[in-house]
């Protein structure tokens, strides 16, 4: 049991199922998945390609909806929200970091960081203030005026992290954030996530890498749409065989 065991649940998935129909066949991307992620946790969700981890992230990030089951974000049932309401939730509560950075090439680092604040209607002066602060936090204040093509891969990912932090979200969802980076730069990005978690951010990291997952405080394995909680840093990773229901109870 981790020190976050009694913290408030941020994400609660209950018996979530997501089915795709491909070539006339039914594919269960998620099969009665149940889990709870609490405030202040640093959780890695690990699985191979096709395991369902991207579908899981999309549902947790309000980018997709389940076919059945219940999803609570900060205690609120997501299924009852409209598309516009879900967009507002994504913008205010969740910061996204993607493998491919997803930076706009014609904009500077600072302008890229300001984008989600524009959608929130934040004033230009406040946008400049906030973007400068988060770029400082990720160590890129001196690169604020540089465009993505003038930055290394690691620097681009730091800009992406800064953009995710700009709206001051409670939750960071990172999808393979080290996947396009060399090992040294990947370690630097993981160190940054650890620092953010120590500062209180709840972080969910999607990865196929055992080494990357080991740096999280808790690890959840997904295989063929089934979720298994592998426990905290004191548990031998990958050995726990926990049912989806049990995973939710023990989280």
Tell me the role of every PLM-derived stretch.
Residues 9-222:
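ABC family nucleotide-binding domain
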Residues 219-232:
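H-loop (His-switch) and adjacent beta-strand-loop-beta switch element
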Residues 190, 212, 228, 236-237:
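Flexible, glycine-rich phosphate/dinucleotide-binding loops
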Residues 1-19, 229-251:
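ABC-family P-loop ATPase nucleotide-binding domain
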């Amino acid at each position: 049991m981790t020190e976050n065991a009694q913290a408030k649940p941020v994400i609660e998935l209950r018996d979530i199922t997501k089915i795709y129909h491909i070539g006339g066949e039914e594919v269960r991307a998620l099969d009665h998945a149940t889990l709870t992620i609490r405030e202040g946790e640093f959780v890695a969700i690990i699985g191979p390609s096709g395991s369902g981890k991207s579908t899981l992230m999309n549902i947790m990030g309000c980018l997709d909806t389940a076919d059945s089951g219940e999803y609570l974000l900060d205690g609120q049932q997501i299924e009852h929200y409209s598309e516009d309401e879900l967009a507002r939730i994504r913008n205010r509560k969740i910061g996204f970091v993607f493998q491919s950075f997803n930076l706009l090439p014609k904009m500077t680092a600072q302008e890229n960081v300001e984008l989600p604040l524009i959608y929130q209607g934040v004033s230009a002066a406040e946008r400049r203030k906030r973007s400068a602060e988060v770029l400082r936090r990720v160590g890129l204040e001196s690169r604020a005026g540089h465009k993505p093509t003038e930055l290394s891969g690691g620097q681009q990912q730091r800009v992406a992290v800064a953009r995710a932090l700009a709206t001051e979200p409670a939750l960071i969802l990172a999808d393979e954030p080290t996947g396009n980076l060399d090992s040294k730069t990947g370690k630097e990005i993981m160190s940054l996530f650890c620092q953010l978690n120590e500062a209180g951010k709840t972080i969910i990291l999607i990865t196929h890498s055992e080494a990357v997952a080991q740096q999280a405080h808790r690890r959840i394995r997904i295989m063929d749409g089934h979720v298994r909680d592998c426990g905290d840093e004191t548990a031998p990773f990958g050995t726990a065989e926990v049912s989806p229901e049990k995973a939710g109870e023990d989280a």
